[in-house]
């Protein structure tokens, strides 16, 4: 955060730098306050889970209702309107994805209504991720499940009580099955609506189509953005262009290659964007936060 503030000195646009820096400061303060609140209040986790359940319910309802309100079942392209009041569908999908770990925790640590309703929401969110059809959320969901399975196996190996091993193994498997079921039924839902209501000939929004587009590099746009970002990084590798100024720096590369002067707002890769804005020193600082938190998480796992 401090280095971001310093980078404003050499930023292309200082006003934009201050604006983005302010957002990072707010995120940092919110994180500190949240940690302090949870350490002080024993009921904070439960309250957080309840808030997550309420908001997730609203998100799921808004996604499914708006699917028909905006005629997405007729024209799949209209799913761009499914933003859930988050600005766009990609942010909406990420917001749904971020709620899943809290719901996993609720299934593993709570009982009765909270546990079973959290399972339902895991199914519903996986279902909605298919409706939103963002490739990054597909990858994110399966990475989450992979981490959950890894933690589950680790926990079972460390636990010496057979009753606990059976109980928790069943819950981990149930979470994975529910999430995958939501994914599969969501895909069937998309295909059903396409077959009965759509007027176009090709379904580009099923799981198969979206995964194939990743494998075939239909992300050529992303790859081109990363290549252009690497070009501006080479021009200023030490200091970068200042916090929040990636979109301005990349203009000199992308405008020369495009006729419409429409450039990318982001690098679609946090590490490349940090490198372009803060230089090598800022990138190392940013990477170190992941390393520190990763080491702390591993220590916590082995402690208990």
Residue spans for each PLM region:
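Alpha-helical transmembrane segments of multi-pass inner-membrane proteins
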Residues: 2-9, 20-33, 43-78, 84-192, ...
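Membrane-anchoring hydrophobic segments
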Residues: 14-18
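Cytoplasmic juxtamembrane interface segments
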Residues: 21-41, 207-225
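Solvent-exposed, non-membrane alpha-helical residues enriched in polar/charged side chains
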Residues: 35-36, 105, 230, 272
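Juxtamembrane loop-helix boundary motifs flanking transmembrane segments in multi-pass membrane proteins
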Residues: 40, 74-78, 157-161, 221, ...
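Extracytoplasmic catalytic-loop and juxtamembrane helix elements of membrane-embedded
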Residues: 70-85, 192-213, 217
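Transmembrane beta-barrel architecture of outer-membrane proteins
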Residues: 99, 269-270
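TM-adjacent membrane-interface loops and short helices in multi-pass inner/ER membrane proteins
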Residues: 196, 205-208, 212-264, 271-285
């Amino acid at each position: 955060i401090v280095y971001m503030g310093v980078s404003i000195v050499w930023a292309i646009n200082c006003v934009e730098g201050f604006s983005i820096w302010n957002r990072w400061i707010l995120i940092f303060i919110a994180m500190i306050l949240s940690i302090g609140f949870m350490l002080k209040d024993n009921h904070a986790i439960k309250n957080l889970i309840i808030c997550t359940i309420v908001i997730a319910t609203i998100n799921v309802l808004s996604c499914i209702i708006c699917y028909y309100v905006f005629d997405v079942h007729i024209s799949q392209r209209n799913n761009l309107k499914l933003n859930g009041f988050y600005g766009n569908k990609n942010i909406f999908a990420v917001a749904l994805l971020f709620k899943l770990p809290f719901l996993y925790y609720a299934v593993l640590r709570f009982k009765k209504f909270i546990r079973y309703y959290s399972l339902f929401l895991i199914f519903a969110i996986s279902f909605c991720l298919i409706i939103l059809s963002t490739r990054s959320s597909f990858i994110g969901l399966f990475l989450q499940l992979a981490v959950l399975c890894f933690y589950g196996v680790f926990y079972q190996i460390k636990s010496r009580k057979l009753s606990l091993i059976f109980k928790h193994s069943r819950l981990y498997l149930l979470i994975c099955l529910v999430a995958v079921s939501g994914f599969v039924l969501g895909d069937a839902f998309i295909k059903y609506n396409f077959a009965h209501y759509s007027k176009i000939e090709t379904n580009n929004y099923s799981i198969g189509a979206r995964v194939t587009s990743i494998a075939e590099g239909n992300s050529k746009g992303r790859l081109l953005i990363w290549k252009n970002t690497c070009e501006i990084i080479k021009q200023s590798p030490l200091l970068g262009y200042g916090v929040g100024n990636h979109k301005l720096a990349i203009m000199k590369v992308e405008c020369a290659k495009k006729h419409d002067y429409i450039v990318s707002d982001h690098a679609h890769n946090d590490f490349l964007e940090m490198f372009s804005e803060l230089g090598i020193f800022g990138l190392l600082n940013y990477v170190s936060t992941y390393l520190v938190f990763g080491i702390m998480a591993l220590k916590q796992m082995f402690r208990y």
